Amino acid sequence: MLFVTVSELRRRYPDCEIFFATAEDLNVDDYQFKTIKYKYRLKQIALGGLKGFRELLISIVADFVKIVIRYPEKKGGYFTLKKFLPQIDLIIDISGFSLGDQWNRQGQEEYLDNVRLAKKYHVKMVLMPQSFGPFDYKQDQQALHAEIRELLSYPNVVYAREQEGAVLLKEHYHLKNVRQSPDLVLQNKELDFDKVFAKKPVIKIPDILPHAVAIVPNKKCFQHGEKEALLSLYHKVIDVLLNSSIEVYLLRHSKEDLTICTMIKALFPDNQRVHLLENDFSCLEFDAVIRKFSFAIVSRFHGAVHSYKNCVPCIILGWAVKYRELALYMNQESYAFDIRANNINEAEILKYTAQMIENFQNEKMKIQEGLSQVQQSNCFNILEEVIHG
């Protein structure tokens, strides 16, 4: 999403200065954008108040200890973010899914801190397409309702990725700035590498045998679903694929999913047609490798997005409404399944796996039609109105 955002901005505003707010250390020499440190403590210091003062003291003490023990880490810079924000013209939030009753209070407060900072420093803000809700908060999170109602009224535009999220924000919190839009990666027709990278990135992907299917699991599915039931499902799905002379590849879209890939491979320890790819693919590499498959069985949202963007059909095994609405955009809703505990319809999944084996070429054409429709609009077109409106 970051690379698409930079590409879209550079296309519209070639001379703009772009900063990626991150807690990580990136080699900026590789990119056509800069970074600004965006750690929790720096955010709290920039927000001020008692919490900000406390975090400032903690930072000073921590740096003093590092000096005493000669810890080789850059120190200081407590007010970097506070000095930086008044100079910014626009904040673009490209979070994926951070607000809803499935997340803990602290994580949601940190998400809302982004809006608090924009509001405090009077910076225009756009929340790019992301998932919201449900908001059936337990008693200890009830205060979030008032915070969401107040803070999400500040951004110039709040893009909800799903209809359900848009309806919840409009009806539950009476927000007037909400619009619905598909995922920004799906809307992007082409990533302009020259506008994003200072050096052409090296893309390394393994060779994939013909007549192959990718399986892209998601660790979160095993948190929302039942482990043994899911492993049994994967075993039966892979049996269906193998019986159709298909090569099966297990690969991860996120680092944390390698353990799940390994668990599934352990179901077929001696079968040479079940391949475990341990590669830590970049988003560009994942995009390149997914094109090699006839279709994919995916549980990662952006794994499905990259598949659809390359007109690769998917059977989606998901745990939230966002998966079904994504499939709906691509005329693929029959292939999206809820695999949360007590919701696994194993017979239907196996039925549609067999159907996909027979019809994946026809499904590709349906996806092409859906993708063409999605790409007729672009959420970044709103920026001209926001900046100059």
Q: Which residues does each predicted region cover?
A:
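Active-site anion-handling motifs in enzyme catalytic cores
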Residues: 1-389
